[in-house]
Amino acid sequence: MRVLGGRCGALLACLLLVLPVSEANFLSKQQASQVLVRKRRANSLLEETKQGNLERECIEELCNKEEAREVFENDPETDYFYPKYLVCLRSFQTGLFTAARQSTNAYPDLRSCVNAIPDQCSPLPCNEDGYMSCKDGKASFTCTCKPGWQGEKCEFDINECKDPSNINGGCSQICDNTPGSYHCSCKNGFVMLSNKKDCKDVDECSLKPSICGTAVCKNIPGDFECECPEGYRYNLKSKSCEDIDECSENMCAQLCVNYPGGYTCYCDGKKGFKLAQDQKSCEVVSVCLPLNLDTKYELLYLAEQFAGVVLYLKFRLPEISRFSAEFDFRTYDSEGVILYAESIDHSAWLLIALRGGKIEVQLKNEHTSKITTGGDVINNGLWNMVSVEELEHSISIKIAKEAVMDINKPGPLFKPENGLLETKVYFAGFPRKVESELIKPINPRLDGCIRSWNLMKQGASGIKEIIQEKQNKHCLVTVEKGSYYPGSGIAQFHIDYNNVSSAEGWHVNVTLNIRPSTGTGVMLALVSGNNTVPFAVSLVDSTSEKSQDILLSVENTVIYRIQALSLCSDQQSHLEFRVNRNNLELSTPLKIETISHEDLQRQLAVLDKAMKAKVATYLGGLPDVPFSATPVNAFYNGCMEVNINGVQLDLDEAISKHNDIRAHSCPSVWKKTKNS
């Protein structure tokens, strides 16, 4: 036997240091000596020249690290083997380290434990999920990976879904990576084809025809939609289309009217607003043709009131006084009362009026009653000086200081009482209902102006002060012939449109001569008793700059639009249209046209039904009807003359008229001067 050298002694010392003292089992001296010696084999010298054998060197005998190297002939394997070899020795040497041995249950004996040490694949270093095989090497190992795995130990899964050479793993929609593999899947609403990669859309509308209820089912990629007409919203619970109340969403700037499937915005035209181009917001109706609205308080406007007296004066003078009146007068009106004078007890009166454009005088007292009309026509829009003077035996009427009439009278016009002559004078109207007392009835309304008045030879003292305080009594400085609608009121007429001699039953033939000052407003409207507007002619600003459109409407539907007319000019525009239950014809400066289409016939049927009942005719705007009754509700602003069924309408003959509407005088167009 040979005794192991210092290496083995050092080894045992190391072993003793590794284990705690409490776990060591000490041997007797004899047993310890047996561990440190081994028997030499025969031919030991010859064996030392051969490559070591693991079985011979380290199992049948104990080996130190140098002897272990003779087995492996390289340091890496030796360094790997020897520490594990010592562990096997501690576990399986008879009587040694029983505590350590008890903890080792992988190998049944020393031979198995030692033989397993050089195998780098035991214990398995490869990832069990990812490896296919493990190949032992010199102090190394090689793991062969399954498809879908990579890494030295096959520990990393390959993400096939992110392979640049096979985009999205070849999946048409969803690529799901899994450990060592992947699979394709489809989004909701798609099914996988047999190739397990491509997806096909599911047509839910065909599979379930009633899936949308009363709505329309529209298949879309991966899903379906239940469609409703514009203005409706789909209700999932009832599976039906419900109207959207857009008005509850504050869609309109002023007034909103909701109806099934839509809504319409309206602006208060009577307050000077119109609907903007966006059909939602409101904007001020702008002036397109400025007019000269300058007035003077020295000019008394006789048509301030549609019904009633403009100015009332009372005189108490000495009994020697006689009636006299001097004034300048201007009008385009042909008929109306200039002034009416009477005694305190109403028994005697004098009327100075205009009839047929000429001065007319009617008088009545205890002695006589007379009527005289004469002189030149003075409703020419020029200022004419008029004087009426009671003389001793007659009444003298002069125009421009030239006598035109002398009316004989047997006595004084007004009888003095108690030494005083008391007389009441009324301008442009009667104080009460005196029509029955007149010698010849007359329409008292007169659109005209007077200035430089001198009544009862008392001058104008006290009268100017009264007029100066009231703007609506002031007359325009310059006027032209025509009717003026200021954009703040309407005039109403009762017109019978029935024509028993015509097969059509009724007809509305209208001629308009207009010179608008603003580009939006209702010019003419027929209104039924139920506050509907079966027919209207309106003006609106066009989308084209500096032009206007004419709208013909039945109720709130536009049946025809005449586009892009230049109406806001200093020249009047002439428009004609004729409508009956079957036809609509119109004439403008640009064309004459007969309108015919299927929808028009339906609308004319609506108009025909209304015309068989009672309708009222309005000029310049609408009465109090709902905003939704017509496309336009703003008042017309400008000059306009109207002829209906061959009759020229006189605003003095209207059933009612706003006081601001001027029946026979239209403001002139504003002309800029160099200094303005």
Swiss-Prot record:
Sum up the protein's function in the record's words: Anticoagulant plasma protein; it is a cofactor to activated protein C in the degradation of coagulation factors Va and VIIIa. It helps to prevent coagulation and stimulating fibrinolysis.
Q: Tell me the CDD domains matching this sequence.
A: EGF_CA (cd00054), LamG (cd00110)
Q: Where is the signal peptide?
A: 1-24
One GO BP annotation is: positive regulation of phosphatidylinositol 3-kinase/protein kinase B signal transduction
Q: What is the effect of changing R515K?
A: No change in secretion of the mutant
Query: Superkingdom, according to UniProt?
Result: Eukaryota
Sites carrying a glycan are N499, N509, N530
Supply the name of the protein: Vitamin K-dependent protein S
What's a Gene Ontology MF term here? Answer: calcium ion binding
Which residues, renumbered to this chain, carry the PTM 4-carboxyglutamate? E47, E48, E55, E57, E60, E61, E66, E67, E70, E73, E77
Name the InterPro entries for this protein: Coagulation_fac-like_Gla_dom (IPR017857), ConA-like_dom_sf (IPR013320), EGF-like_Ca-bd_dom (IPR001881), EGF-like_CS (IPR013032), EGF-like_dom (IPR000742), EGF-type_Asp/Asn_hydroxyl_site (IPR000152), EGF_Ca-bd_CS (IPR018097), GAS-SHBG-PROS (IPR051145)
Residue span(s) of domain Laminin G-like: 299-475, 484-666
Tell me what effect the entry lists for G95R.
Answer: In THPH5; the activated protein cofactor activity is inhibited by C4BPB with a dose dependency similar to that of wild-type PROS1
Q: What is the effect of changing R90C?
A: In THPH5; produces around 50% of PROS1 levels compared to wild-type; has impaired secretion; intracellular degradation of unsecreted material is found
Q: What organism is the protein native to?
A: Homo sapiens (Human)
Cited PROSITE patterns: ASX_HYDROXYL, EGF_1, EGF_2, EGF_3, EGF_CA, GLA_1, GLA_2, LAM_G_DOMAIN
